């Protein structure tokens, strides 16, 4: 199973992790980093582990998400049985229609 982060997902993850550390401290940073790592392991173990992403239901392909915590979710697309693309680490307070920018 190959899991690939898009450039946008890498950028968003970096911003979120950097902000977690600078605003809330090392413990918050570690907690978020561990949540991302665990989500990747779960997706690798079972690609359909995440729920279907309702904001992308009209898009072609199978888009899913895994909650990282109360505020963030990891949005991904199952490309085929051996490839998954991580599209975004999404702040759930954002307008879900903007998620289409990452597909």
Give the positions of each predicted feature.
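A short, surface-exposed loop/turn module that caps and links secondary-structure elements
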Residues: 41-67
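Arg/Lys-rich, positively charged N-terminal/basic patches that mediate binding to nucleic acids
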Residues: 1-37
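Charged, solvent-exposed alpha-helical segments that act as regulatory interaction surfaces
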Residues: 22, 26, 45, 49-52, ...
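Enriched for short, Lys/Arg-rich terminal
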Residues: 68-103
């Amino acid at each position: 199973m190959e899991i690939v982060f898009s450039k946008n997902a890498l950028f968003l993850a970096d911003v979120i992790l950097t902000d977690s550390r600078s605003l809330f401290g090392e413990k918050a940073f570690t907690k978020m980093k561990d949540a991302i790592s665990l989500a990747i392991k779960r997706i690798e173990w079972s690609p359909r582990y995440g729920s279907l992403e309702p904001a992308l239901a009209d898009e072609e392909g199978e888009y899913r998400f895994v909650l990282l915590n109360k505020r963030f979710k990891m949005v991904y697309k199952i490309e085929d049985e051996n490839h998954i693309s991580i599209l975004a680490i999404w702040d759930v307070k954002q307008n879900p229609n903007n998620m289409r920018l990452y597909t």
